[in-house]
């Protein structure tokens, strides 16, 4: 084969495997699918109800190995100016300076610092959230739902569900304390596409 002696065949094959090993091992790079990723939040409204609002990820990246979470890391920007409360007037009110202050801080930013693995599908993501120009440490319990090739074979996707409880006062939002709750419950449904297929122009439909 290729005119090489048998011993050199083995040496050549071993060298090829060693060259491929770094490509096959370790955490892979992902980008968040901003279409299929959503952030839902809820806050008490004067004791009457807990209305919901919707936010979207503007951009973000993830480094992740489903088998070894030690090198996992992520950063993402959340579009605050696009908040959706289901009503244009309510959207504008939430964006005012007393609450989200979208004019001065149109994005929130999260950067992870470490991942605490609990089992094969559950963990806690620790990091720093910058909201309204104020940075605070937060922890998000999360579930790894699935990491696999999609049914259409177009992408390798990692999907997560996470939750958080935020005290808005820690981020300088203290207005309307008599009618709006202090604690905000947050749910995140995230899908991230592995970068090795990001060059594809094909898009999956829901």
Where are these regions (language model features)?
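Low-complexity, acidic/polar, glycine-enriched regions of mature
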Residues: 25-206
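Bacterial N-terminal signal peptides that target proteins for export
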Residues: 2-13
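N-terminal signal peptide c-region/cleavage motif recognized by signal peptidases
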Residues: 20-22
